[in-house]
From Swiss-Prot:
Keyword line: Coiled coil, Membrane, Transmembrane, Transmembrane helix
Cytoplasmic domain ranges by topology: 1-97
Function comment: Involved in membrane trafficking during cytokinesis and cell elongation.
UniProt name for this protein: Synaptobrevin homolog 1
Matching Pfam families: Synaptobrevin
Residue numbers on the Vesicular membrane side: 119-121
Family matches, as SUPFAM superfamilies: SNARE fusion complex
Superkingdom assignment: Eukaryota
Organism in which the protein naturally occurs: Schizosaccharomyces pombe (strain 972 / ATCC 24843) (Fission yeast)
Entry-linked CDD domains: R-SNARE_Snc1 (cd15874)
Length: 121
């Protein structure tokens, strides 16, 4: 019965190795070592990438919190600005009303005596 193929388990030595041919056995070992080195490098790079993604996620969470706080502050600012705008509008209207009433009173004070003077003659 044969076992299933597993690329991570080295194969049995070939007939050339068993017969003592050292040159034939060193080539597969060098290839295996080179491939293992590439795998180790890839694993290292992937671990770095995973670490960077994790850090990025933390920064994104922090940025999301700051964005939420800014949105709440902006909403409060908008409400306060509207309140101040309405208050200033009423203040402006009161000032205009006072000026109009003052002009009417001034005209009455000037025109009524003149009209009574000419009407009385």
């Amino acid at each position: 019965m044969s076992e299933p193929y597993d690329p991570y388990i080295p194969a049995e030595p070939s007939a050339a190795v068993r017969s003592g041919n050292a040159a034939a056995s060193s080539t597969p070992n060098m290839k295996t070592a080179a491939i293992q080195q590439q795998i180790d490098d890839t694993v290292g790079i992937m671990r770095e990438n995973i670490s960077k993604v994790s850090e990025r996620g933390e920064r994104l969470d922090s940025l999301q919190d700051k964005t939420d706080n800014l949105a709440v502050s902006a909403q409060g600012f908008r409400r306060g600005a509207n309140r101040v705008r309405k208050k200033m509008w009423w203040k402006d209207m009161r000032m205009r009303l006072c000026i109009i009433i003052g002009i009417i009173i001034l005209l009455v004070v000037i025109i009524v005596p003149i009209a009574t003077k000419f009407h009385g003659k």
